[in-house]
A protein has these predicted regions:
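Helical segment within the ABC ATPase nucleotide-binding domain
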Residues: 197-211, 222
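A short, proline-enriched helix->beta-strand linker immediately N-terminal to the Walker B motif
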Residues: 176-180
C-alpha cells in the first residue's frame, strides 16, 4: 500500500520573487518567500497595505498581469505541479475549479446586469459540466452560505442585496466550483464588525464541511484567532514570521 499523502502539502511555494517592471522602475513585490498549505488547513497571510500579501494570493494561479509582473525566481507547486510552468489552458482549468478566490469588493466581482442565479450557474456550468440540475446546485450553495429563501433570492440582482448578502453570494459562487483551496482576500473589510464575524464563522464551518483549505489574506490580526491554523506575517515583500496561530499571536 502507498504511504499516506497527507504529509505532502497541497500547495508549496518556494523562494518566490515577483517584480513589477514599469517605465518608472522596478518594484520588488515579493522577495524570496516560501510557505506551504496542507489539505484542510487554514493559513492566514497578514500584513499591512503594500506588504505583498495580495500579490502572493494572485500569483498562485498567475492572475497578475504579465507585464508588468515578472516571476524572477521560485516555484509554486500545487498538487505536485509547478503552476509557473503550466500552459494557459492548464491555468484556466486550475482557476476557479481547483483554486477559487473571494475578493474584497463583491460589488465589483458581481455583474449588475445578471441575476444571482445566472452568475452562480455560469460558474457551475464552466467548471462542473457533469451537473444535471444546475438550479438545485445554486439553491444548495446559497443555502450553505446562510441565505434565507434561496429559491426566491436567486432571482434577485446584486443591487437588491445588502453588502453582507453580496459577499455571501461571492462565497457561494466560489464554493460551487468545489475548489481545493479558497483564497479569501480581505473578504470582510467592507462589512460591519458583526457581519464580519458571521462570515468568518461561516467560512470555518464550510471548510470543515467541504474539507478544503483556506488562505485568508488580511491586515486584521483581530479576525484570524478563531479561524487560522497557521499565520504568515508579511512585511515589505518578505515573510518575517510564520508559525502556529497561538504562538504568533502571543
Amino acid at each position: 500500500s502507498l504511504p499516506a499523502m497527507s504529509d505532502q502539502p497541497l500547495l508549496d511555494v518556494r523562494n518566490l520573487s515577483i517584480d513589477f517592471v514599469t517605465e518608472s522602475g522596478v518594484t520588488n513585490a515579493t522577495k524570496g518567500i516560501s510557505f506551504h498549505l496542507k489539505k484542510g488547513e487554514t493559513l492566514a497571510v497578514v500584513g499591512e497595505s503594500g506588504s505583498g500579501k495580495s500579490v502572493t494570493g494572485l500569483a498562485l494561479t498567475r492572475l497578475l498581469p504579465e507585464p508588468p509582473a515578472v516571476y524572477r525566481t521560485g516555484e509554486i507547486f500545487f498538487d505536485g505541479k509547478d503552476v509557473l510552468k503550466l500552459s494557459p489552458k492548464e491555468l484556466r482549468a486550475l482557476r476557479g475549479a481547483r483554486i477559487a478566490y473571494i475578493f474584497q469588493e463583491p460589488s465589483t466581482s458581481l455583474n449588475p446586469v445578471f441575476t444571482i442565479r445566472n452568475q452562480i450557474a455560469e460558474a457551475i456550468e464552466l467548471h462542473r459540466p457533469d451537473v444535471t440540475d444546475v438550479d438545485e446546485e445554486v439553491v444548495k450553495y446559497l443555502d450553505m452560505v446562510g441565505i434565507v429563501n434561496p429559491r426566491q433570492r436567486m432571482n434577485d440582482y446584486p443591487h437588491q442585496l445588502s453588502g453582507g448578502m453580496q459577499q455571501r453570494v461571492m462565497i457561494a459562487m466560489a464554493l460551487s466550483c468545489q475548489p481545493d483551496i479558497l483564497v479569501a482576500d480581505e473578504p470582510t473589510t467592507a462589512l460591519d464588525v458583526t457581519i464580519q464575524a458571521q462570515i468568518i464563522e461561516q467560512l470555518v464551518k464550510l471548510k470543515e464541511q467541504l474539507s478544503m483549505s483556506i488562505i485568508l489574506i488580511t491586515h486584521n490580526f483581530g479576525i484570524i484567532g478563531g479561524i487560522a491554523d497557521r499565520v504568515a506575517v508579511m512585511f515589505r515583500g518578505k515573510i518575517v514570521e510564520e508559525g502556529e496561530t497561538r504562538s504568533v499571536l502571543h
